[in-house]
Amino acid sequence: TLSESVNMRPILMKGHERPLTFLKYNREGDLLFSCAKDHTPTVWFADNGERLGTYKGHNGAVWCCDLSRDCRRLITGSADQSAKLWDVQTGAELFTFKFDSPARAVNFAVGDKLAVITTDPFMELTSAIHVKTISSDPHERAYLF
């Protein structure tokens, strides 16, 4: 049977100080990205659970994340009414998209030239879908066109 042939061992990953909100593997499956209410997205080695790094800059719970196809950029959505674009390798914040309500979901489009971000209803505002153009040059600061 399958359960007899697969030898699974649990890996305990310690690092977040508040509850987790989202998990995402990269395409190769060797990295795991986690989001939590502690404001700090984190990247882990998937095979041993070792923390590789964190992405510091949000001031609220981080609800979600997505990776570019080449795994060079990470986008995160937060309760701090922003979505942030990061350099995966260095952890550098590349750009911040600001909104009038919390960013609840983020996703890169095929080709990584567009990102879609949804925002929650907030006070008198309704929920919204925002499509943002992403620069192909990671050093270019003008991510919005």
Segments predicted by a language model, with ranges:
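Conserved strand-to-loop turn within each blade of WD40 beta-propeller repeats
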Residues: 28, 35-38, 45, 77-80, ...
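WD40/WD-repeat beta-propeller blade-loop signature
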Residues: 9, 16-19, 28, 51, ...
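Loop/turn segments within WD40 beta-propeller blades
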Residues: 24-29, 66-71, 107-113
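Short C-terminal beta-strands that terminate individual repeats in beta-propeller domains
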Residues: 2, 9-15, 35, 51-57, ...
